[in-house]
A protein has these predicted regions:
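Subset-of-secretome marker
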Residues: 62-65, 87-108, 178, 198-204, ...
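Hydrophobic secondary-structure segments that place a key small or acidic residue at a functional site
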Residues: 120-125, 129-212
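Structural beta->alpha junctions
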Residues: 62-66, 190-191, 229-236
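N-terminal Sec/SRP start-transfer signal
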Residues: 1-33
Length: 276
């Protein structure tokens, strides 16, 4: 009788252990499934955020070093469907009367003391859409970015501002070939250029960013150095560039069209790999 009871108790105990083991395994499986679903949901949200916020687009520039992009061509591309934003740019070099440029450290270049150096001037529709800012080479430290609504406005580098005692709200004269433009400093940025500087005008510290009209007044031309466009969605970039290339009466032998789609495609592929 005692043997029968003992065997029965042992069987029950074994079933309990087996049941607990099965319960633990099922709990682990459900935890892993929930974790996988959470990761997939997180990556899906990340993908949507990346697609919504990244600056996928293309730029048009002349194939000639000193060439220009006609404003009428730039505006025709701007009005294509699915263009989310644009940024027109005009670049030149100019003098800054009464101001001292930052010297090129270790360049070995000696300028005549009677010859004033020139700063690089970039006029833009929106300063925050310039490659230096979207690529994180420059960071806005004070003030605000320039928009298409600003007139006679500029951003200056922190080092240049400190050397000349400049602060937001101050006036700054810019001269080019007898033309003069007075701008108000709206903001101060910091950072370095992508490439080493040889001349003063190559230095980020001597880079002056203005509204587009101010730079065009200095050059005496309404034409552009570069026109940049951003797609509403990364998946629309190819069709958008194809439509730009098929615009009538545009000689694409004279212009280059480059896009940054390959950079962001890798990011999206990595996210998709984790999802799968």
């Amino acid at each position: 009788m005692m043997t029968t009871i003992k065997r029965a108790w042992t069987a029950v105990a074994r079933k309990r252990r087996r049941s607990l083991t099965i319960a633990l395994i099922m709990t682990l499986i459900f935890t892993l499934l929930i974790g996988t679903l959470t990761v997939q949901q997180t990556m899906a949200q990340l993908k949507q955020s990346v697609e919504r916020n990244i600056r996928v687009g293309f730029s048009i520039a002349s194939k000639q070093p000193s060439g220009e992009v006609p404003m009428d061509i730039a505006q025709r591309v701007q009005h294509l469907d699915k263009v989310k934003a644009h940024n027109f740019q005009a670049e030149t070099t100019a003098g800054l009367p009464g101001k001292q440029l930052v010297d090129v450290a270790g360049s070995g270049v000696q300028l005549d003391s009677n010859v004033a150096g020139e700063a690089k001037v970039t006029g833009a529709t929106q300063s925050d859409l310039l490659g230096e800012f979207t690529g994180r080479f420059y960071q806005l430290e004070q003030g605000k970015h320039l928009t298409e609504h600003d007139q006679n406005a500029a951003l200056v580098h922190k080092t240049f501002a400190e050397k000349n005692g400049i602060k937001p709200g101050d006036k700054l004269d810019i001269t080019k070939d007898g033309r003069r433009v007075t701008v108000t400093v709206m903001g101060i940025f910091s950072g370095k250029g992508e490439k080493p500087a040889v001349l003063q005008s190559d230095m980020a510290e001597n880079h002056l960013i203005t509204d587009l009209a101010a730079a065009q007044q200095l050059t005496g031309s309404q034409q552009l150095t570069r026109a940049t466009y951003f797609a509403e969605n990364p998946h629309q970039l190819k069709s958008l560039t194809d439509r730009a290339k098929n615009l009538p009466n545009v000689d694409w032998q004279k212009f280059s069209l480059t896009d940054n789609g390959a950079v962001f495609a890798g990011v999206l592929q990595n996210i998709a790999g984790i999802q799968n």
